[in-house]
Design a protein with these regions (language model features):
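Short Gly/Thr/Asp-enriched flexible loops that form oxyanion-binding sites at enzyme active sites
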Residues: 99-107, 150-157, 307-326, 362-365
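An N-terminal, well-structured beta->alpha segment
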Residues: 5-103, 192-228, 240
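Conserved phosphate/anionic-ligand binding catalytic regions in large, soluble enzymes, centered on
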Residues: 38-58, 143-146, 232, 236-248, ...
């Protein structure tokens, strides 16, 4: 059927509820809007679903959630592990509780038990719950840091990580095979509960999760010594982090935690920010205002699903510095690996894991501590996959993993990035350095002096709709057919094409495999430890240009990064 026929089917079929039909009636005269909503199904990709909330096959609604869940249920039933059940969590967004219940009711109608959190919870706790409850899978209703009109649906497998091969393709195929909405199963929530197929979970999982985080503390002595003096400003950005982040800090002994009141309570409209993203300066405006009032040492903000952490740290002159995800990740990697090395030594087969778009300072840290370094595709699920590989092969030990987009994992209690454990560890590190009369900024400067003045940045273009998607593909194909030989004065040493699974040495012409799964990503290794990577976003209508350089000082790094940024923008303009 064409999009107009599908639109009419949704308008007239008794299966669809009155609110859905009323919403569709309101767009009856808007042909473009009808087409956008019905020209395709909302794609269930490797990251699950993510889209604008609304009626239509290309929108997030109870029917597209039911379709995704029916496909997942079919896959689970074929796997033979349906009796293990599925854990379900949700965030503070519009319709998140409703979508979580819809998923649970669909699973129950298929004979699969759902364990549903009683209220909003962080993404990492869902990952932990899958493992703790020994479920076959997990569902998380969240769109992370997207604008308020979005919501999403992420699927986790039994190891607690987001789905990777072969499960991702298997589930995607099952979801695609569900073509008739009226055949999808569901049942009333009360009936599911009465049948023992819908169990509400909460405090017992919270307590176990917090206990796991506490196991990662290295220097409780430092917290005991100065934790009561350290001043911390924290914002959950209207999301899920408020209760667990403040709980862990209080229980460890951090007494001066100031929450940003305007952003404390869950609110899917995110009224104080246009974009609830801890990478954005806007997200810190209220936090920094409070920090200056109370003279805080550090300012922290977690994104709405509390898997990513933004950081500002105060130097000894009272100035606050923004730590990018690369900087905070390296600060934590150096602290965690360095302190464990000093206290009890490191395992011979220990590994630091990073994504391909993450700073090369990580490589320098791994070299310094003589640990292995593993590079994976963008997406924390690939770090989770490596941890599973260590466990199943009994070879290799996880030390730390992070990605440039403000996410890391300390410990293996979860298999997704965890901003609650990161909040805990960063405050612990601040306490430790405070006992040495150092700030976190002092520690960062010390790292630059030891490893090099690395600076990394990103430029992105937003291209929405059908035409935008085509343009994004055109940009990648143009670069693929005409690879640059020089970028911003840096020679291209190697060109990696993850879609073609090739690494070409630009000097010798030799071609080798990337050793990673195929992905529509281009990467250029440049001279002087610089690099550039181009990839479409997996969650937003964007194409992203990541790049990094290494300078001889902070000012030199700033200059080189600015020059690289200008060159990247010029490249984009030329292609566009």
């Amino acid at each position: 059927m064409g999009y107009k026929e599908i639109y009419n089917e949704w308008l007239t079929n008794a299966y669809f509820d009155a609110d859905t039909k009323a919403e569709l009636e309101r767009i009856a005269s808007d042909e473009n809007e009808i087409k956008e909503r019905f020209y395709t199904d909302l794609e269930f990709g490797t990251a699950g679903l993510r889209g604008i909330i609304g009626a239509g096959t290309n929108r997030m609604n109870i029917y597209t959630v039911r379709k995704a869940t029916q496909g997942l249920a079919n896959y689970i039933l074929k796997s033979g592990n349906a009796e293990k059940g599925v854990a379900i969590a949700f965030d503070s967004r519009r319709m998140s509780p409703e979508f979580a219940q819809e998923a649970a009711c669909c699973l129950a109608a298929n004979g699969i038990k759902a364990y549903v959190f009683d209220s909003l919870r962080p993404t990492p706790e869902l990952s932990y719950a899958v493992r703790k409850l020994e479920c076959i899978a997990g569902i998380n209703i969240t769109a992370s840091h997207n604008p308020p009109e979005y919501n999403g649906y992420k699927v986790y497998w039994e190891d607690g990580a987001q789905i990777t091969p072969p499960h991702d393709k298997g589930i995607m195929d099952e979801v695609k095979a569900v073509t008739d909405y009226t055949t999808m199963k569901t049942m009333p929530a009360e009936d599911a509960k009465a049948a023992g197929l819908y169990e509400v979970i909460g405090a017992e999982v919270d307590d176990a999760y917090i206990a796991e985080l506490k196991k990662q503390v290295i220097h409780q002595d430092a917290i005991d010594a100065v934790g009561k003096d350290l001043k911390i400003v924290y914002s959950p950005l209207h999301g899920t982090g408020n209760i667990p982040a403040r709980r862990i800090l209080k229980e460890l002994g951090f007494e001066n935690v100031y929450v940003v009141k305007e952003q404390e309570l869950p609110d899917g409209e995110f009224p104080t920010v246009s974009y609830p993203n801890p990478e954005a300066a806007e997200a810190f405006e209220l936090g920094l205002k409070l920090a200056r009032e109370v003279d805080a040492d550090i300012v922290l903000a977690t994104d709405p699903d509390a898997d990513r952490l933004g950081v500002r740290v105060k130097d000894k002159n009272g100035e606050y510095h923004d730590l990018t995800g690369n900087m905070s990740g390296c600060l934590l990697a150096d602290y965690e690996i360095g302190q464990r090395s000093a206290l009890r030594g490191l395992p011979e087969d220990g590994y630091l894991i990073k994504t391909i778009v993450t700073t090369n300072m990580a490589d320098a840290i791994a070299d310094y501590y003589n640990t292995g370094l593993i590079e994976v595709l963008t997406g924390f699920k690939y770090i989770g996959q490596q941890i599973l590989g260590f466990e199943t092969s009994k070879k290799g030990e996880y030390l730390f993993g992070f990605e440039e987009s403000y996410g890391c994992l300390i410990g293996t209690h979860a298999r997704d990035k965890d901003a609650i454990v990161a909040t805990m560890a960063l405050c612990e590190a601040a306490a430790y350095y405070k006992t040495k009369d150092m700030t976190l900024w002092d520690a960062m400067i010390e790292m630059y002096e030891r490893y090099g003045y690395y600076k990394d940045d990103i430029q992105s273009i937003t291209l929405k709709g059908i035409e935008g998607l085509a343009k994004i593909q055109e940009i990648l194909e143009t670069l693929r057919k005409n690879p640059p030989t020089e970028i911003a004065g840096y020679k291209v040493l190697k060109a990696r094409d993850y879609k073609a699974d090739t690494i070409q040495d630009m000097q010798t012409g030799e071609v080798s495999s990337t050793g990673l799964p195929t992905s529509n990503v281009l990467y250029y290794d440049l001279s002087d430890d610089a690099w550039l990577c181009v990839r479409p976003s997996g969650t937003e209508p964007k194409v992203k240009f990541y790049y990094g350089i290494k300078g001889t000082s902070l000012s030199d790094a700033d200059e080189k990064s600015a020059a690289m940024g200008k060159e990247v923008l010029a490249m984009i303009d030329k292609i566009m």
